[in-house]
């Protein structure tokens, strides 16, 4: 995070610098299947309503590190009591583990500032990614905030244990789409990008209907024959730390149009408002959309909820679309 400050050392504005091999704005590609060895490119997705959206190849700020596996092993340790000579042998067992291949920042609804990513440790638990700062370490706050105060404190996650990070009774419906004045609606209305949208130049938050092509009828579904994926079991989702979804909409339950290839959504986890801690890394890839408090749940083993709504204080991923 790079910030400009005034004479009193107060942050006036800040920017998130994403250092990656991903190049935004290149022509979209059609890939039959996801290959983690390739840099992801934008993909053209058709939703249930027949509207096309060009999704970024991965969520904002995603850093891929490759998959590291640790096999199960055991080590015997012998202890000898110096005075009596008694010997005790114990066996230390290391269970197999997979270290998270990547991570991405989370965003509270309507904020431009990234919240600290989560990642899996060697035991498989979701933990905070290491953070290096000079006086601005990431922290959690039980307080609510105004828009202005949140800009001055981009390192603070507001609204822990509170369903809204906005102070008072205010609801800012248009933070991520300037013309939107609605809540919990799903449509293909044009998104008017705002200064609070964290997306790179040329991209913005998706319209609230953008994900409906990922189930056979555009609604919340579970089961591999009901969601638009080549996966038939949990194996690939576990290995890839994410889910592939077909870009062309389904032709019916269990019927797929594979001609458009797949688009990948990372399971980088989330920060729900209840505790503000990262959770479900390697399991969940919930993404925000532009309409107030709307998101799409993409979760292992086989859940896609294109028309979901949740607390604005929770922090989820952002996988934007082309303007």
Regions from the PLM with identified roles:
Residues 3-193, 291, 295-296, 308-314, ...:
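Short, compositionally biased
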Residues 146-323:
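C-terminal, surface-exposed recognition/capping segments
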